[in-house]
Amino acid sequence: MLKEKYDEAAIRDLICDYRDFHPFPKGDERQLVEGLPDCLQKRWIEAGKRYLDFSWPPLPAVRFMDFKRNGNRSEFEKLHFKRRNVLATLVLAEYMEGKGRFLDQIINGIWAICEETFWGVPAHNYVSGYPDAPLPDVNEPIIDLFAGETAGLLCWTYYLLKSQLDKVTPLICRRIETEVKRRILDPYMERDDFWWMGLLSIRPVNNWNPWCNSNCLTAFLIIEKDRDRRVKAVRKALESLDAFMAVYHDDGGCDEGTSYWGRAGASLFDCLELLFWASGGRINFYNEPLVQQIGRYIYRAHIHDEYFINFADGGARVAIAASLVYRYGQRIGDQRLVDMGISAYHLQAEKRKQYAGEIVPASLLRQL
């Protein structure tokens, strides 16, 4: 469906150079950044201030091994996600304030994460060639959900703050380039056997497909300088996303449950937005009936406020990504979806006040 619409030659003509990828103002475009609402700037700056003296937690090998030894994944994950959430918070704080006081801690966070053996989590080590191994193999970089999320975090950090980081030393952003290339860009181009890609008949794909693809696309659009590789990566992503859409019925229903829509249909939207931005709107799939139906599913499963029909792994209450739902509705011209995003934003107002100054989730694309 998607791959058929744009062949490699068309993608080459439509996709922008990496230097021209500019979906958001960068951190050195102060006039544009400072035009954001004061309440938004204050919220992120206050959140970042909490971590000016943060001690970055180590990730002990034995905590990774816990999963194979006793089934505990949470102890490692607490440390893993803490690092990423703190870095995301500091990045947004520096982006908003622009005075440099968060940069040292941002550098500490970047360096700590770049030093990790594996950017994923123990429960996903089965994706490797040694699925029963208690530790990750440094010689086989694999792409799971959170290796992808980590790459996305570092790439958006690079995009937003490269100018400021380069003034300290260009080695910081070069390190991001090196690690993202080794862990994400090269495996994505060289391998077809990650089950989530759907390129081989290994197992049916699910939300992993658009979620991983969205972060891999982010990395190629921001970091990859070779035009041929960028074009081939986009083409491969379209083929992979076709495998995801092939498991959907015409009504766009998400068989994984409503709470998974946020990383299934919504991650498909992330992918389509990245391509839309990278082509100046010329790579556009928003008129595709199935793309529209996948978006509409979330309001068709809605009961009231934050309550949704719960089935499969879906909970009864879901805090949807309000801005994403709003933008999805705008793209497909569906006012009901737009209104749902607006309603969710107002419903979540009290929660935003309650957690003002708290840590920001690591997915920077969703925050931007």
Residue ranges and their predicted role:
Residues 266, 270-368:
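Carbohydrate-active enzyme catalytic cores, enriched for enzymes
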Residues 133-257, 270, 348, 360-368:
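Active-site lining segments of carbohydrate-active enzymes
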Residues 33-82, 92-96:
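Asp/Glu-centered strand-loop micro-motifs enriched in Gly/Pro and often flanked by an aromatic residue
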Residues 82-96, 108-112, 148-159:
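Non-membrane alpha-helical segments in proteins
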Residues 48-59, 106-124, 172-197, 232-252, ...:
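Long, well-ordered core segments of solenoidal/helical folds
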Residues 94-107, 157-181, 220-238, 275-291, ...:
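Structural helix-adjacent loops and short alpha-helical linkers that scaffold large soluble proteins
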Residues 64-75, 125-144, 196-207, 211, ...:
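Carbohydrate-binding/catalytic loop surfaces
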Residues 1-44, 92-95:
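Extreme N-terminal leader/anchor segments
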